[in-house]
Curated annotation (Swiss-Prot):
This is Undecaprenyl phosphate-alpha-4-amino-4-deoxy-L-arabinose arabinosyl transferase. The gene is arnT. It is an enzyme of class 2 (transferase). It catalyses: 4-amino-4-deoxy-alpha-L-arabinopyranosyl di-trans,octa-cis-undecaprenyl phosphate + lipid IVA = lipid IIA + di-trans,octa-cis-undecaprenyl phosphate. It is a multi-pass membrane protein.
């Protein structure tokens, strides 16, 4: 802890640079998420339209606007690079860590604990996986974290003026959250604070001052809400009923999963700090009266977790907002353990990292080398990747072992367990995964044919977004499948963006009279190119991605 106290800021900055900045540009974009958000912002900048999101020139109503604004600004500053695509998420994660540090300082007035909380947060597997990935979840997590910090300020406020200011800030944070991901940003803070206001008997205060937060949120979001309602009257109907009600509650909700789905996600997500999880949560409950700030954090963790577990639609990214309060609970528990020399949990944490690292290293070595016949992850030419992956996870285990030694004296170095893996992960991905989920590699290998084509079509929205991003054109056509663009394609002015499988042959005859045609299809595992497709002048196949190139006819 002395090391954190003496040079915590420098160590934290170094860790952030190594994990969140250094390796980011070299990693290819993943489809469908990263290619989608990259292309939406590229098109917004190209069109100069910061009100209505479009993807491939088609209306895209799945999310509000603020997250795209983050990404727009990133691309405007850093250009069309993978780093720019991910910088919005990285910046949001950094600000979330700042809020974690600030709240820890407000709670405990201890710089070492504050730095530790921020370090735990930034080093959590779920946080750095999503926080360096181009999705909107780091941004909504930022605003939910900010809203809970603002709510804590309302609890500390002593005068009516201070309470009004704190509730106004709370409303502004919720308003930004709403403009990032919708009504979720309003529901999560409300359910998080209910147990707190009940325990502290502040229900009356919430009723009196709560409307100030509502007014603040409305004032912030109303200009864009009215602007898009004027431009696209159907936006709010689609966004509310389809994106919220169906996704979370109805029988046909997207990404359905059992109620216990988040338990293993939570355990994996807090690595390399899993050994602190049970006792930190238990401490928050046992000391809820003596240390009400721990109950504040516990409610912030559990209420959203219960809410997302009950909802039918589930994704691992949904519980990212739970990581900030968890890091604070863990920091408080670890600090108490270290101060009282109760090192058992810290040793257990090291043992978990040791076991996890070496089990993963062994599994990758055995499977990667083809020693388990029916499990094929890497090709015969990818043994170097297998060795690097084995070394990366072995490094995780070695650091875990080091944190156990000398009575867990260096327990806080658990943050370094995933460091080697993070730095190398871009070079460890099997080629079959790259060719399926990272279309930039495929596009670059077939760039001449694709860039010279008058028409480019594909049967995957994620691949289409990748094509549009790499080729800097938004007129990529959808072939056979509509995917998440189904709603936007229903508009009369977007009908020509889609070609059905039945109409493709006739369409191709006319299209080839105007120029070359490229069709990119994504195959299932071991699937062959369908015989029903017209014979191409050139075929390029890379695992599950295939390019059928048709030359212009005289």
């Amino acid at each position: 802890m002395k090391l954190l106290k003496g040079s915590g800021a420098a160590l934290l900055a170094l860790f952030f640079a190594l994990v969140y900045l250094l390796p980011i540009n070299s990693r290819l974009l993943w489809q469908p998420d990263e290619t989608r958000y990259a292309e939406i912002s590229r098109e917004m900048l190209q069109r100069g339209d910061w009100v209505v999101p479009h993807l491939l020139g088609i209306r895209y109503f799945e999310k509000p606007i603020a997250g795209y604004w983050f990404n727009n600004i990133s691309q405007w500053i850093f250009g069309d690079t993978n780093f720019a695509v991910r910088f919005g998420s990285i910046f949001s994660t950094a600000l979330s860590a700042v809020f974690v540090y600030w709240l820890a300082t407000l709670l405990w007035r201890n710089r070492s604990t504050s730095f530790l909380a921020a370090l735990i947060y930034l080093s959590m597997l779920l946080v750095f996986s999503i926080g360096s990935y181009a999705v909107l979840d780091p941004m909504i997590s930022l605003w939910l974290t900010a809203s809970m910090v603002c709510f804590y300020l309302t609890l500390r406020a002593e005068t009516a003026k201070q309470k009004i200011g704190a509730y106004l800030l709370l409303g502004l944070a919720c308003g930004m959250g709403f403009m990032t991901k919708g009504f979720l940003a309003l529901a999560v803070p409300v359910i998080s604070v209910l147990p707190i206001v009940i325990q502290q008997k502040r229900v009356k205060e919430l009723i009196i001052f709560g409307p100030i937060a509502i007014v603040g949120a409305v004032i912030l979001s109303l200009p864009w809400a009215l602007a898009i309602a004027q431009r696209e009257p159907d936006f709010w109907h689609y966004f509310f009923w389809v994106e919220h009600i169906q996704r979370f509650a109805e029988k046909d909700a997207q990404h359905k999963a059992p109620i216990w789905y988040y338990l293993p996600i939570l355990c994996l997500g807090v690595l390399p700090w899993l050994g602190l999880l049970p006792a930190a949560l238990l401490k928050g409950w046992r000391e809820r009266v003596a240390r009400p700030e721990l109950f504040f954090l516990l409610s912030w963790v559990l209420m959203p977790l219960i809410f997302f577990s009950v909802a039918k639609g589930k994704l691992p990214t949904y519980i990212l907002p739970c990581m900030a309060p968890l890091s604070l609970l863990m920091a408080a528990y670890a600090t108490d353990c270290a101060n009282k020399m109760h090192m058992r949990a810290l040793k257990v944490n090291g043992a978990i990292n040791l076991i996890f690292g070496f089990i993963c290293a062994l599994a990758i070595l055995v499977i990667g080398m083809g020693w388990v016949g029916h499990l094929v992850a890497y090709g015969p030419q990818e043994h170097q990747k297998v060795i690097l992956a084995t070394i990366a996870f072995a490094g995780w285990g070695i650091v875990g072992f080091a944190t156990m030694r000398n009575n867990a004296r260096h327990w806080h170095w658990a943050a370094a367990c995933p460091l080697l893996f993070i730095l190398l992960v871009g070079y460890l991905i099997p080629q079959q995964v790259i060719d399926s989920k990272q279309p930039q590699n495929f596009i670059q290998n077939n760039f001449n044919e694709l860039s010279s084509s008058r028409y480019v079509a594909t049967d995957s929205v994620g691949v289409a977004a990748g094509l549009a991003w790499e080729l800097k054109r938004s007129d990529i056509l959808m072939f056979s499948e509509k995917g998440e663009l189904s709603y936007g394609l229903n508009y009369a002015d977007s009908g020509d963006h889609y070609i059905s499988a039945q109409d493709f042959s006739d369409w191709l005859v006319h299209a080839r009279q105007k120029g070359d045609v490229s069709l990119v299809i994504q195959l299932s595992r071991n699937e062959k190119i369908p015989d029903s497709l017209p014979a191409a002048d050139k075929v390029s196949l890379m695992n599950r991605l295939a390019l059928l190139w048709y030359k212009k006819t005289p």
